[in-house]
Regions:
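Serine-hydrolase catalytic-loop signature spanning alpha/beta hydrolases and amidase-signature enzymes
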Residues: 110-112, 145
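Active-site-proximal cap/loop segments of hydrolase catalytic domains
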Residues: 119-357
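Short secondary-structure junction motifs
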Residues: 34, 97-99, 189, 293
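Short beta-strands and strand-coil junctions in structured, solvent-facing domains, enriched
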Residues: 92-94, 112, 273-274
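Exposed loop/turn and edge beta-strand positions of beta-sandwich/beta-sheet ligand-binding modules
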Residues: 68-70, 80, 100, 188, ...
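Short beta-strand element of the alpha/beta-hydrolase
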Residues: 88, 96-110
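Glycine-rich His-Gly loop
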Residues: 29, 105-109, 198-201, 269
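Non-catalytic accessory segments flanking enzyme active sites
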Residues: 1-95, 133-136, 140
């Protein structure tokens, strides 16, 4: 197709831009090979010439190079098409190895139409990079990971706000995702954890409150749990607390702390500067959960803001998360959790009896 060549090197003495003087710089990657840069010299007839590799970046995690990765597609009970990226440990075979503990790591988003909510945001050909705070770290510990499952909150029509049915849509999306990974034989339904960062942490806490049958535990990092403390809007919510008080309260895990019976790990940076996620959010939520008898742990990372940067903080976060997942998603963890819950309930009853006497 005809096109134009634009150069920032001009002037009366400038040589014309021709194909044979052009060199193209591009990058290439695959699901198992990290991105490398190449140079391609063009020829006068427009055909590509010699390709030269000009970088040789080492693989960032060679032990997890051949990760089984699949973009799975499924439907919510109202017909909305959803998708997510399912990872399993290297060498895993569902028929041979059976179901695994699974970590679902997500971040819900608002949409105005079902079509927009159903769009695919990932590519099966993208390189799988694993950062220090990525959920994919747990593949090395034998967990399956459902990364970024679509949890759309949709508000179609004039005057319809997505968040007015936030809880119902969130639970429907999570249930569809869990049903899919269980039906595939990849996930043990009694050993599924849910987690997220920021608005994903808010999501994880809500799912423990409103869909306790789906998850064994949750990890919530740097979240906001009381929406009355963000009264002038949050995410895509433009209404104020005074314009939509019912929605703000219904969406707040803090207001539903008494419903949370499954274990939840709260992690927060001590100096979180994000406008909606001050440390107070996790501190108050922790107190509410403890007061209602939930199994909860709060980890505060000193000198950290909304994201964690220090090596010590990241290692601490990974260690706490590892211990939490192993305690609640390992074989036999459900019986142990039930025993702990019964012990805590008995201690609470004993304390109440002593007060009444």
């Amino acid at each position: 197709h005809p096109g134009s060549l634009i150069s920032d090197y001009g002037g009366p003495e400038a040589a014309p831009v021709t194909l044979e003087t052009m060199r193209i710089l591009f990058s290439r990657e695959s699901p198992s090979e990290n991105s490398q840069f190449f140079s391609l010299q063009m020829t006068a007839d427009g055909s590509p010439g010699k390709e030269v590799k000009i970088s040789n970046f080492p693989h960032p995690h060679p032990d997890l190079k051949e990760l089984p990765k699949e973009i799975i597609k499924y439907k919510r009970d109202d017909g909305v098409e959803l998708n997510g990226t399912l990872y399993t440990p290297p060498g895993y075979d569902a028929a041979r190895d059976g179901p695994l503990p699974l970590l679902m790591w997500a971040y819900p988003r608002e949409f105005k139409t079902k079509e927009a909510a159903s769009q695919l945001r990932d590519s099966p050909y993208r390189f799988t990079g694993i950062g220090p705070s990525s959920a994919l770290v747990w593949l090395a510990r034998g967990y399956a990971v459902l990364d970024g499952p679509a949890l759309p909150i949709i508000g179609e029509g004039e005057g319809v706000e997505p968040n007015d049915t936030y809880v119902e849509q969130l639970v429907a999306g999570a249930r569809a995702a869990v049903n899919e990974v269980v039906a595939r034989g990849v996930a043990d339904p009694e050993r599924i954890a849910v987690g997220g960062h920021s608005y994903g942490a808010f999501m994880a806490a809500n799912l423990l409150a409103h869909a306790p049958d789906l998850f064994a535990c949750a990890i919530a990092r740097s979240g906001a749990y009381n929406r009355t403390l963000t009264p002038f809007g949050f995410q895509a919510e433009e209404r104020t607390l005074w314009e939509a008080p019912e929605t703000y309260n219904a969406m707040s895990p803090f207001m539903n702390a008494h419903k949370i019976k499954k274990p939840i790990l709260l992690i927060h940076g001590e100096e979180d500067q994000n406008s909606g996620t001050h440390l107070m959010q996790s501190e108050r939520f922790f107190s509410a959960l403890k007061g209602n008898g939930a199994e909860v742990k709060l980890v505060i990372l000193p000198h950290e803001s909304h994201g964690y940067r220090a090596k010590e903080s990241i290692n601490h976060m990974l260690a706490e998360t590892s211990d939490w997942l192993d305690a609640h998603c390992a074989p036999g963890a459900k019986k142990a959790a039930e025993a702990r819950a019964e012990e805590a309930a008995k201690a609470k009853r004993d304390a109440e009896e002593m007060v009444s006497k």
